[in-house]
Amino acid sequence: MHESQLTTSAAKPSRLGWFDDVLLLGIMAVLAGCGLIYEYLLSHYAGRILGALEAAIYTMIGLMIVSMGLGAFAARKIKDAFTGFVVLELTVALCGSLAILITAAVIGFGQQLPMLIASTLGLPPDQLPEGGMIGTLQKLSEYLPYFWGVLLGLMIGMEIPLIARVRQSLSDEHLLHNAGTIYGADYIGAGIGAAIWVGFMLAIDIQLAAALTASFNLLAGFVFIWRFWQKIQRPKLLLAAHLVVTGVLLLLAIQGPSWEQQFNNLLYKDKVVYAKATRFQQLTFTERLRGNGLSPVYALYINGRLQFSSSDEHIYHAFLVHPTLAASARHNKVLIIGGGDGLGLKQVLRWEPEQVTLLDLDAALVQLFKSPDPDMPERLSQALLSLNGNAFNDPRVTVIHDDAFNGVDKLIAKGDKYDAIIVDLPDPSHPDLNKLYSDYFYRKLKELISNDGALTVQSTSPYHAQKAFISVAKTLALAGFDVKQYHHNVPSFGEWGWSIATLDGKDAQHRLAQLTKLPIADDWLTLGLVKGAFEFPANFYQDATNIKPNELGSLQLYHYHQQAWSETQGLDLF
């Protein structure tokens, strides 16, 4: 009887223990979150480099998903699932932590190469070698994030098949729903990873985020070595390799952000003196020193795109603000949407309004121009406060931090009315920005503007993005406004344009034409410049009938803008 019981017990297949099962599924969930964060990290960085964030995101995610599928097939070639998984996570950790830094170094060197060659050969600054092989190398370097995306995608795609094989090998009986169980953990982990990205990692340095993410891949390798030591080939060697990479990750977490910033600084013409990652965007300030007692030139870049230069920002903001207020019957109550640097606000305050409301999403950006970061160089902080005339500390100013699309609804609900509205938003280079140029948004603003007031929208370049420029006017008209457009040269941007809209009475151009002088004196702007700004080439609007307004959900303006950007920059993602 006793012998029979032993025989029965020996014949019974061993089952996967609950501890190992929970451990493996937990590892799978964590790695899924890491994989999604790598997608976001690389696509976000690629968008900053290429200047086409939305296209970069879709391209990166598409490439990584396809690569993950190929990686799942390639996992068949790995004979030892235990050892293969440990080596895989070690490699993912190393590549994931170094991808951003190496990309920044290569692109930075590519941008500096023409200047290095010119300096070596004694060429003048206006004859930098930028064509031929140098131009090709620079272009190829911009696609390096996609190389990392494909490589990491291949390796991430191997994780699920290997975990599935490990689970099965730990049980003598066939595991029902093995794939479904693992995919369930994978999906949940990916969702958690997305939440971590949005809630935490967007606000920290991108290189630090990469190092932190890679540390979880490395931790998965450590756990496997500890738990399955007897099943792994050369565990001591792999443990030593993990310890070495741990040191690399610590170094990258501490020094990586400053190294990455130094490489990124090579992308700018002038010296980078301050950089900050807010929850919504990357802010970079540059400084160009000038001799002969002239003050330095400061510039702000958001996600790599120039927002203003202190050498000519007054031209842009004078044309944005003064025609608007001059065309308004009153200017006691003014609304500014965007304009978180306070430069337009400074010009508005010159009209002695009773109240100004500024609606901007990024509180961290506004804070830098109100009470600069202690880590910011003193000369820069003083320059910023001087540029905007310390406008944010004026008691007449109310700042609301909210998404403009929803924020204006709250103003409408309160029954607010404004004598003038100035919309100073970034170009519609992203679908989220596109809706702020839609007919629906302009109809909201129609509820806020006084019948005899004026509304002005910065409308991108009429030269580089003609269709987008005209589409803004047609969208305002669709919303019920009487629209005129004007333009002027801003040296840092080239030819730039604005759309000015009214509701009742004469249009803004006629109102301004009746003036004999500007109500306020300006060092740059004259009434003659304002009136002349409404003149366009004879054939400028000849194809306007074929240009569509930007209805909500159509993304029409976004596509016009992206097309113009691609043609101007020679950008082709495929």
UniProtKB/Swiss-Prot annotation:
Domain PABS, residue spans: 257-505
Any one Gene Ontology BP term: spermidine biosynthetic process
Binding site for spermidine: H317, D341
Catalytic activity: S-adenosyl 3-(methylsulfanyl)propylamine + putrescine = S-methyl-5'-thioadenosine + spermidine + H(+)
Coiled coil, from the record: none
One MF annotation (Gene Ontology) recorded for this entry: spermidine synthase activity
A cellular component annotation (GO) from this entry: plasma membrane
Subunit structure: Homodimer or homotetramer.
Recorded family membership: Belongs to the spermidine/spermine synthase family.
Protein name in UniProt: Polyamine aminopropyltransferase
Source organism of this protein record: Shewanella oneidensis (strain ATCC 700550 / JCM 31522 / CIP 106686 / LMG 19005 / NCIMB 14063 / MR-1)
Organismal lineage: Bacteria, Pseudomonadati, Pseudomonadota, Gammaproteobacteria, Alteromonadales
Gene for this chain: speE
